[in-house]
Amino acid sequence: MEPVSHQDMPRLSWIDTLYSNFNYGTDGYDAEGNEEHKNSREGSETMPYIDESPTMSPQLSARSQDSVDGVSPTPTEVLLPGGESESDKGLLMRKLVLSGVLASEEIYINQLEALLLPMKPLKATASTSQPVLTLQQINDIFYKIEDIYQMHKDFYDKLCPIVQQWDNKTTVGHLFQKLATQLGVYKAFVDNYKFALETAEKCSQCNVQFFKISEDLKVKGPKDSKEQPQSVTMEALLYKPIDRVTRSTLVLHDLLKHTPTDHPDYPLLQDALRISQNFLSSINEDIDPRRTAVTTPKGEPRQLVKDGFLVELSENSRKLRHLFLFTDLLLCAKLKKTTVGKHQQYDCKWYIPLADLVFPSLEESEPIHQLHATPDYEIEEMKAKISVLKSEIQKEKKSNKGSSRAIERLKKKMFEYESWLLLYSPTIPFRIHNKNGKSYLFLLSSDYERSEWREAIQKLQKKDLQALALSPFELQVLTASCFKLRTVHNVPIISHKDDDESPGLYGFLHVIVKSAKGFSHSSNFYCTLEVDSFGYFVSKAKTRVFRDTSEPEWNEEFEIELEGSQCLRILCYETCYDKSKLNKDNNEIVDKIMGKGQIQLDPQGVQSKNWHDDVIEMNGIKVEFSMKFSSRDMSLKRTPSKKQTGVFGVKISVVTKRERSKVPYIVRQCIEEVEKRGIEEVGIYRISGVATDIQALKAAFDANSKDILMMLSDMDINAIAGTLKLYFRELPEPLLTDRLYLAFMEGIALSDPAAKENCMMHLLRSLPDPNLITFLFLLHHLKKVAENEPINKMSLHNLATVFGPTLLRPSEVEIKGHMNLASDIWSHDVMAQVQVLLYYLQHPPISFSELKRSTLYYSTDV
């Protein structure tokens, strides 16, 4: 973690945080319930009229008209007909801006009406023997609301007929000038706001009747709308005037931009803008920022140290949250739903003072019984769908007739798929406890990321932290500041990337983890490798544990598939054999991280076919490794073996004829060993074996070594499984043959079950006997593996995902004849390849003899 620099940390005055979250369009409400209405405000990433310099007291900028970029609700090129003068277009934009003001004012007035509605009955009961609130409490809560309501009601009533009977010569400047001169009433409201909130909160705690009233105020929709009244809390409505006070300033800038300088309104609007800016500047000067939540209890500025999107497991449901780590507290927020054209808003879900935050030990943690991990096949299918959509988007862009609407539709669908993947793929638990007993659980995809969060929090906890409790007002202000302070603006998905950003690498990265130096003591060490895939990091490989040394030498090679990857991470662990610290969850990593580091995968630097040596330094530890990259189109090519005496890269018919067997010896031996001692191995066939072990087995089988059985019995089971996959991958043509590839693709796409059955069985009969017998032998084995799914976590879907693209691939002729890149073919066909194998895996047992003599299937020749 880089040291926190005070110079780089943005700081906000409380009025800046209040006024940085607004939008002069119509207000929207989250429909999830009352809880979602609390602390609601409009958000805007762009604040052209408020100085955002990193000071404690940012001031409003009185910029000239020419320096202002106006905010227009609709693109002018869509709205404005051709042939009009610039002056006419500007005046039309004036009307559009004013129409937006009217719609916004109507909603704001409805909100104020909803807030005032309970005031009269409350006052009526105040003089009775059983008052709900005292007259003083009512005045404190509703202070200046009536004046603000009347001010905006008068403005709306006068502006509405002018806009409805629009004429380019019509003037509205006098209305905005009058509204600006009345802004002083907001000053009184702002000064009383915190006291009004505290009074309302105390009254809600003491009086059940008032609590019910304050939690369910009904705001009606626009008069021409059929929308039902929405339920909003009093706390949220009391914030609306503060949220509103700067909107007239934005509107004035827009009106000035689209008003000719010789128009009668121009000097009036300039005067209104001057008055409004002076008013807001005076508020900046009058308010003491130390009263607010942007300072710590010790009066020091509260700074944002780290933020990011994480998945929280809440009430047995996954929720995407934005986590903010400040110098003295951790705040968890959600992005509120907003209507089209509106900016994002945050809603605080909870916060923990760092003085009260603890990380539970494993013996204190409860196992995550309620967590149901998403099946791997669903994750892989979603990745395949995303790849297909990416290819379709590229096709649309390259096409001369490419429709921007079609591209946007595809991007929207891709965003939905990526959001699902981001939510359901993480499985590594990250627990946080409050000393008061409340606990929270996040799920991450990367132990690297979990370590970063833990280290950042623990570093801050070494300081002299004081207990704190934020008032509702302070929490509102802090949540509002998150929008401006955040460093991570978008969820980490690839559809957010611009076209000119690097798309990352697609293909296979070969990594040899050699050795490590710099450990202070002898112990048992190992490394894991992570790469980013579809916007988030995933653990891809793990070395063996090198025992009782301070200078481990692994010298292990791994083949890692890259899917738009841009970064490689290496984590170095020391094993923990304390039985009290054994993991309670399958995905819990309890070993100690000794160091971690990462390097960028530069497309230019790794495209070389030669090995590239590198070193990653981490906490005084140096890990040496080498890597090289092979593109995806190269991996589609099957290179025949130059030595026909071997088995790898040799036609299966040649091998079976030479061996005088129906199934190649390598297939039989690997399957026998897996069924003997790997049938219950978690992730069998999915977890990569050590590349050097696989190459050793490959060489032994090619040489027909007498020691092969001894090697198999001593070898890691994942290496044996990897050898079997490598054999099928290196066949000169896939097991299901090049000739039948398109027929399999068409057959699996049939909708009628009977027609599909007929076609798929006919295709099996069309295979050469060695291919068919070997395929049926493999099917029988994979079904046995899937029978142990509760233990090995490998379902039929998972196995189909692993073997489908290996047994069934397009031929090189089809690749060359395809207009798009090989990666496009890969993306489009991978789902179908998986579905073909899955169809046969889910089918009742298929006998070679019955299949050959069966008269059930009637089909024309392929």
UniProtKB/Swiss-Prot annotation:
Entry GO terms, CC: axon; dendritic spine; membrane
Protein keywords: Cell projection, GTPase activation, Guanine-nucleotide releasing factor, Synapse
UniProt entry tagged with the keyword rRNA-binding: no
SUPFAM superfamilies: C2 domain (Calcium/lipid-binding domain, CaLB), DBL homology domain (DH-domain), GTPase activation domain, GAP, PH domain-like
Any one GO molecular-function label of the UniProt entry: guanyl-nucleotide exchange factor activity
Residues covered by the C2 domain: 488-616
Biased composition (Polar residues): 54-67
Ranges where the DH domain occurs: 93-286
Residues covered by the PH domain: 303-462
Positions bearing the site annotation: Arginine finger: R686
Record InterPro entries: Abr/Bcr (IPR037769), ABR_PH (IPR037865), C2_dom (IPR000008), C2_domain_sf (IPR035892), DBL_dom_sf (IPR035899), DH_dom (IPR000219), GDS_CDC24_CS (IPR001331), PH-like_dom_sf (IPR011993)
Entry remark concerning the domains of this protein: The central Dbl homology (DH) domain functions as a guanine nucleotide exchange factor (GEF) that modulates the GTPases CDC42, RHOA and RAC1. Promotes the conversion of CDC42, RHOA and RAC1 from the GDP-bound to the GTP-bound form. The C-terminus is a Rho-GAP domain which stimulates GTP hydrolysis by RAC1, RAC2 and CDC42. The protein has a unique structure having two opposing regulatory activities toward small GTP-binding proteins.
Protein name: Active breakpoint cluster region-related protein
Organism: Xenopus laevis (African clawed frog)
